[in-house]
Amino acid sequence: MKNINPTQTSAWQALQKHFDEMKDVSLADLFAKDGDRFSKFSATFDDQMLVDFSKNRITEETLAKLQDLAKETDLAGAIKSMFSGEKINRTEDRAVLHVALRNRSNTPIMVDGKDVMPEVNAVLEKMKTFSEEIISGSWKGYTGKAITDVVNIGIGGSDLGPFMVTEALRPYKNHLNMHFVSNVDGTHIAEVLKKVNPETTLFLVASKTFTTQETMTNAHSARDWFLATAGDNKHVAKHFAALSTNGKAVGEFGIDTANMFEFWDWVGGRYSLWSAIGLSIILSVGYDNFVELLSGAHAMDKHFANTAPEKNLPVLLALIGIWYNNFFGAETEAILPYDQYMHRFAAYFQQGNMESNGKYVDRNGNAVDYQTGPIIWGEPGTNGQHAFYQLIHQGTKMVPCDFIAPATTHNALSDHHQKLLSNFFAQTEALAFGKARDVVEQEYRDLGKDPATLENVVPFKVFEGNRPTNSILLREITPFSLGALIALYEHKIFTQGAILNIFTFDQWGVELGKQLANRILPELGDDKDINSHDSSTNGLINRYKSWRA
């Protein structure tokens, strides 16, 4: 990958000039001038997904200039580098190949001269065999009973992805009850353990190194809880499996290494749900549905790798995001799924985006003088409408939004889905076009209100509009369409990182807090006051010691 400061390109300078021409242009005017705007600024993927980006503050000229930026920063070369197994994660000297995990074409993908696909397929086959034993009930616990509950113990990428997907695909789930434990706060695992029976519970310990503090603390507590009933250490092997690469530590824990599912250093944590980390997904919805998830992602991978940038959905969404973040000064993006099963989707891509592109140093090691990753947040509709949409509609901050909805629901109760979708359509229309003062005044006159009332109330009922949105309409949330949607966002994030000249696939920002926590932990073992930190940290620790039970 080339190291090009995007702000030093001629395309960036052209975009800055273009922004000065565009900053006061309204969406209402853009739509009024072009009756064909929707067809020009929308695209359908695989007859499964409609992406409408027409309600953005862009013109064809805007997109052309953004595409020039992609060309000048060699996005095409960056895409080829990732798919060909080059070590584009340079700070960790690793390839970035989550695309290999869902390579359903099974074409060779090389890392260090070796095709990784045979190993990928072998782990998938092992997961298939194991999951079929658990789901069928042929796998028995230490008292001869079949497994009824699965507890996934992990954190970050070992938790957020599997949890999001198992929730999103709940309509496809089998009889197994899924539980997820991530937080080192003992409350998290304590509450889960209240719901399960040691005789019929399987624990998945998801840690590549088998040393992650939060995960191993929870795993040891789960094992202690299990042994309090089971008694004999030999029973651990029937109730614990590992998603890891550290066979020695896994064996010492009591897990049979035959039930250790490996993945590789070219799989980043936040891109790992496609790997052995996705075992909880397979146990929840079955192997065939997991393969459909992989197939949907692979279809989007092929679209991303092979489609011209002018028609390339991840590229288009990425460029529009850069336009708002760096030229309009928008600091956040909201992801708003109108599907309750998708309630963890925004949280998943909060990590996916912010841990990937939350960097202030470029690929040359220099501090950047432009914006990199945005703040990502969101909640399902319509809940969000009654919480934070007020600020999006009438606040002082621009919040570009992605609205996501399925045309067909899994729960066709009465007219619920029509009401949900009427809100989905209405919100993007309201955000784009608003409500002008003269319209509000006329509404009040039609109600027979006197002029004094008009003056007191009308200013507060005006909606400026011109708030940008993307709408992503799926036929239905299926394993295939969900896989494609996740991959769409993954490649959007990669595209932005490539253009913005940052390393998307490391996460050094999580390390300093860990180091300091490891230094502080021994200081909490007694009741002595400490003075080894700044006055604030000393004061907090000493008050904690005096207050704790």
Curated annotation (Swiss-Prot):
PROSITE patterns: P_GLUCOSE_ISOMERASE_1, P_GLUCOSE_ISOMERASE_2, P_GLUCOSE_ISOMERASE_3. GO terms for biological process: gluconeogenesis; glucose 6-phosphate metabolic process; glycolytic process. The keyword Isomerase applies. Keywords: Cytoplasm, Gluconeogenesis, Glycolysis, Isomerase. It catalyses: alpha-D-glucose 6-phosphate = beta-D-fructose 6-phosphate. Its EC number is 5.3.1.9. The keyword Isomerase applies. Pathway: Carbohydrate biosynthesis; gluconeogenesis; Carbohydrate degradation; glycolysis; D-glyceraldehyde 3-phosphate and glycerone phosphate from D-glucose: step 2/4. Signal peptide: none annotated. Its main location: cytoplasm. Coiled coil: none annotated. GO terms for molecular function: carbohydrate derivative binding; glucose-6-phosphate isomerase activity; monosaccharide binding. GO terms for cellular component: cytosol. Pfam families: PGI (PF00342). HAMAP family: G6P_isomerase. Catalyzes the reversible isomerization of glucose-6-phosphate to fructose-6-phosphate. Belongs to the GPI family. This is Glucose-6-phosphate isomerase. The gene is pgi.
